[in-house]
Amino acid sequence: MFPMVTGFMSYGQQTIRATRYIGQSFITTLSHTNRLPITIHYPYEKSITPERFRGRIHFEFDKCIACEVCVRVCPIDLPVVDWRFEKDIKRKQLLNYSIDFGVCIFCGNCVEYCPTSCLSMTEEYELSTYDRHELNYNQIALSRLPISIMGDYTIQTIRNSSESKINKEKSSNSRTITDY
């Protein structure tokens, strides 16, 4: 009869322990009810990209000297640089520059090693199309500046309203390179 009593006592202790664990999990769950949701509704809300985000590449035709360093440092030899040698000025003349973003891995080596800084990474990441051939950007498409997420009034950014009001007041007085 003694083992039966100890069995009931251990059963009671296990029940109390299980009740305590369930209570702790309920408290943890209820403590998260005041939090904002982490998931964003992508087409209508966009997260703000970090300062050094590696998005679409921006190209400045006038700065390029056709040295082809970007092609040499690219792991997949992606940029296509067409040039001709001008004998009268003894320099390369850039004719065409293109990048296929369907193949690009956005490593940023071309931007990092460009001696004239004619390449830069933008915050634009929406490059989806129905035809993969539309992702082959020439120098005209590459020189197009991206629409800033902060300036687009149709999109809500993921920030607290008081924080975004302070930032709007600061940004109305001065514009940075990322505010196009």
From Swiss-Prot:
Compartmental location: Plastid, Chloroplast thylakoid membrane
Top-level division of the source organism's lineage: Eukaryota
Coiled-coil stretches: none
Residue sites binding [4Fe-4S] cluster 1 per the record: 64, 67, 70, 114
Family annotation (InterPro entries): 4Fe4S_Fe-S-bd, 4Fe4S_Fe_S_CS, NADH_quinone_OxRdtase_chainI, NDHI
Any one cellular-component term (Gene Ontology): chloroplast thylakoid membrane
The UniProt record lists the keyword Cell cycle: no
Catalytic activity reported: a plastoquinone + NADH + (n+1) H(+)(in) = a plastoquinol + NAD(+) + n H(+)(out); a plastoquinone + NADPH + (n+1) H(+)(in) = a plastoquinol + NADP(+) + n H(+)(out)
Residues at which [4Fe-4S] cluster 2 binds: 74, 104, 107, 110
Known cofactor(s): [4Fe-4S] cluster
GO BP terms: photosynthesis, light reaction
Note describing how the cofactor binds: Binds 2 [4Fe-4S] clusters per subunit.
Pfam families per the UniProt record, alphabetical: Fer4_7
EC number in record: 7.1.1.-
Topology class, membrane: Peripheral membrane protein
Major enzyme class: translocase
GO molecular function: 4 iron, 4 sulfur cluster binding; iron ion binding; NADH dehydrogenase (ubiquinone) activity; quinone binding
Keywords: 4Fe-4S, Chloroplast, Iron, Iron-sulfur, Membrane, Metal-binding, NAD, NADP, Plastid, Plastoquinone, Quinone, Repeat, Thylakoid, Translocase
4Fe-4S ferredoxin-type domain span: 55-84, 95-124
Family membership noted in the UniProt record: Belongs to the complex I 23 kDa subunit family.
NCBIfam families: ndhI, NuoI, PRK05888.1-3
Protein function: NDH shuttles electrons from NAD(P)H:plastoquinone, via FMN and iron-sulfur (Fe-S) centers, to quinones in the photosynthetic chain and possibly in a chloroplast respiratory chain. The immediate electron acceptor for the enzyme in this species is believed to be plastoquinone. Couples the redox reaction to proton translocation, and thus conserves the redox energy in a proton gradient.
Self-association state and partner proteins as the record states: NDH is composed of at least 16 different subunits, 5 of which are encoded in the nucleus.
Protein name: NAD(P)H-quinone oxidoreductase subunit I, chloroplastic
Gene that produces this protein: ndhI
